[in-house]
Structure formats: structure tokens, C-alpha cells
Amino acid sequence: QEVDLDWAYEVARGHSPTGRVMLERFLPGPQVSTESLVIEGNAYTPGFADRNYEYLERYAPHIIENGGQLPSHLNVTTQQAVRDLVQKAASSMGIRNGVVKGDIVLADGQPYVIELAARLSGGYFCTHEIPLNTGVDLVGAAIRQALGESIDTKELLPKWNRPVAQRYLFPSLGVVRAVEGADR
């Protein structure tokens, strides 16, 4: 999609306290969110969700995610390539123990890091979606690891693979005049 770079530069610069601007290239392709626990340098990634961007055209040039779903539609080989990239990226950040949240795009069949952060995800991904999808209590394991307890890596292995989907709603402007059926 074409974007007026002069306009984008001025808008970004107007919000920059230093007047500096960073330009990134948009890589088209499916995106996934990952959630990992790193134990002694090894990343265990029970959280793996396809991200949903059905409103890219509506909100352009802004990129608004409107949910995700598990299990991923990606094949096992591609999922492993994503896990390997998360492992490599976490290692390059020096993370030997702790949590890693990753957002990855697959462009031309190759995974690329959009974001990698030493934190848990928000938006119910780590607290609700991963446990519902896999039976893995990643938040509990992360808390126990932070308290210095050892984690049995078997508890990070999925117990099942149940479908889970979440969508964010962006309703049109208006006024709610009534709510019917709330008593049922």
C-alpha cells in the first residue's frame, strides 16, 4: 500500500522528543504471536497464535490487529522455523531465564521478528488463550521461575490442542438505546 512518506515523516517527527524518526519496511505475510519461557538458555514455546488483520484496508496506514486464533494454520515445519527464530532472538538478547513474547511475520516463506520483548503478552493471550488451547499454565510457571523455583519442562508441553479464537470489536459510532435479552 502506498503511503505519503513526507506526511508520515512529519507526523512521526511531531511525536518524537528528539526529532529523530525510525523508518521500517512493512513485510506482507501471515503473522503469529508466540509466548515462551526460557530455561537455562532454552526457549519453550507453548503459545503460538495466528494474528488476525482483516481490517488493514479500513485503518490504513495504521496497522490494527483485531484478534487471533489457536491452533495455528501453519504447518509443523514452519512453526518450528518460527520457534527456532524466537530461540535465536532470545539468545541474542542475552535472555537465559525468563519470559519472551514474540511477534513474527512470515514473508516469502521466511520468519522475521517484528517484536521480541522480555515480558508476557497482554490481551488475554498468556492468561486465557494459551491455557484454553494447550492446558499449559505459562503464567504460573513464569511466576514460579521468577521466585527462583525450578520448572519441570514437561509442564510446558501442550496437554491438548483445542481451538480458541478472540476478536476485538470496533463498532460504528452511535448510541446504544437498549439491551435486549440480558435477563436470559
Question: What do these predicted regions represent?
Answer:
Residues 2, 31, 76-83, 132, ...:
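Electropositive phosphate-/nucleotide-binding environments in soluble metabolic enzymes
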Residues 12-20, 27-71, 80-101, 105-112, ...:
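Phosphate-binding core of ATP-grasp and ATP-grasp-like enzymes
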Residues 1, 36, 169-172:
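Short beta-strand-to-loop capping motifs
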Residues 141-184:
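Peripheral (often C-terminal) accessory segments that flank ATP-dependent C-N-forming ligase machineries
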Residues 119-141:
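ATP-dependent carboxylate-activation loops
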Residues 25, 71-75, 131, 156:
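Alpha-helix initiation/capping motif
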